[in-house]
Design a protein with these regions (language model features):
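All-alpha RGS (Regulator of G-protein Signaling) helical domain and cognate RGS-like helical scaffolds
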Residues: 21-211
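Hydrophobic alpha-helical membrane-insertion segments, chiefly the h-region
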Residues: 7-23
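Positively charged n-region of N-terminal signal peptides that target proteins for export
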Residues: 1-4
Length: 211
């Protein structure tokens, strides 16, 4: 009797082992073949620099309005500045900002993107619709510049335009704009930051000279 029991246990154990082996083999056969994980170091396909994305259009729209106010201030200084250095600087800035703005509007028009001009916003002090991008002058500042005379024009223009350039650079250096795609616009943005940084230093030197 004892031999029968022992024999039965052995048979059951062998059978269980066989069933287990069969189960594991079938699980391995039916499981989907694991695919190799792409290497983390493999870089993604670079974006096409001849195409544009949302960040490109958003930046262009901001700069159109921002630049148009800069042109407005520079044009006032062109006519009314008392110092020749300040007047010549205003002439150059007006030309540069006008050229850059035309380039941004041309791109947006080509891409069938709508945009606002500064003149589209109501000129009401404190109005919620008036642009308040970094560095932009208030309407009261603009009116003060328009009514200023003599050396007051130079002083106020330099103060407002330094802030205006610094604000433009702040916009251009925003973290999210690292995702810009359109190569020509990125180049223009970077060139403008460099140029306006130099102009800020020039304006500060003019201030130090008493302008």
């Amino acid at each position: 009797m004892r031999k029968i029991v022992v024999g039965t246990i052995i048979v059951l154990a062998v059978g269980a082992a066989a069933i287990g082996w069969w189960f594991l083999q079938n699980q391995s056969a039916s499981a989907p073949e694991s695919k190799p994980t792409p290497s983390a170091s493999k870089s993604e396909k670079p974006a096409n620099p001849n195409e544009h994305n949302y960040m490109d259009t958003d930046f262009a729209k901001k700069m159109i309005v921002h630049n148009q106010q800069g042109i407005q201030m520079a044009d006032i200084a062109k006519k009314n500045a008392s110092g020749e250095e300040v007047r010549q600087l205003a002439v150059r800035m007006s030309d540069e900002l006008t050229s850059d703005t035309k380039q941004y509007t041309d791109w947006l028009t080509e891409w069938k993107e709508t945009y606002f001009n500064l003149s589209d916003f109501p000129e009401m002090e404190g109005h919620d619709m008036y642009p308040t991008h970094p560095g932009m002058a208030s309407l009261s500042d603009l009116r003060e510049l328009e009514s200023a005379t003599g050396s007051s024009v130079d002083k106020l223009f330099l103060r407002l335009m330094i802030a205006h350039h610094e604000g433009a650079n702040e916009i251009s250096n925003a973290e999210y704009l690292k995702g810009m795609q359109f190569g020509q616009m990125i180049n223009l943005k970077n060139k403008t930051v460099k140029k306006q940084t130099e102009e800020i230093q020039t304006m500060k030197q003019l201030q130090a000279k008493g302008n």
